[in-house]
């Protein structure tokens, strides 16, 4: 779970690296299917420039900066949350018509998460259950 990931990160297995490197943060952002702005919103960070600085590892003045341990913990919790969402999507589809239905990007947030989050979770669910299919939750409209 998230706490296990976090414990491994701070247990010394990182060989002198910070709890989470900028490259790891960027990778988790991509893994979660979120844009930089969306991840900033999930973390309660007002200015997404802060995230970009963490990705790089230095700020605008050229000073080395590290990702705060609390942010690393929050990201680990988001990863665990998405893993649970993927399991829930799979269970729902397996109990029904074997189709995982995902929102379109223009749809409103679902359970506080954007469509990109749900697509990433659906792909993970399908990877675990190849018999499932993924389709849109609603038909396309000219505005999509």
Question: What is the meaning of each model-derived region?
Answer:
Residues 83-144:
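Helix-turn-helix/homeodomain-like alpha-helical modules used for DNA recognition
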Residues 38-43:
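Short alpha-helical "recognition helix" segments of helix-turn-helix
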Residues 26, 37, 126:
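Short glycine-/small-residue-rich flexible loop motifs, especially phosphate/cofactor-binding loops
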Residues 54-55, 71, 75, 79:
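DNA major-groove recognition helix of helix-turn-helix
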Residues 1-6:
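Short, small-residue-biased leader/transition segments that mark boundaries at the very start
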Residues 8-32:
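A short, Lys/Arg-rich alpha-helix, primarily the initiator
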Residues 44-67:
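Recognition helix of helix-turn-helix/homeodomain-like DNA-binding domains
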